[in-house]
């Protein structure tokens, strides 16, 4: 199975959406290598970065679902290297 490493950048502008986001991330916990969250109180938003290791379609499924949550923006950067596990 071909896997990719990716970094997912998430900006949370609606704090009421955090519970939905955390629930979704829990569903995909097995592909998350690391997570860093930064509250930016001066701007009333939070920034989350995820490092993931999974097939590209699974990463796309996760980011697509994140993008459907109200008040959340998401972008993904993929590594060029493909791993065959």
State where each predicted segment sits.
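Long, contiguous binding/interaction regions
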Residues: 1-85
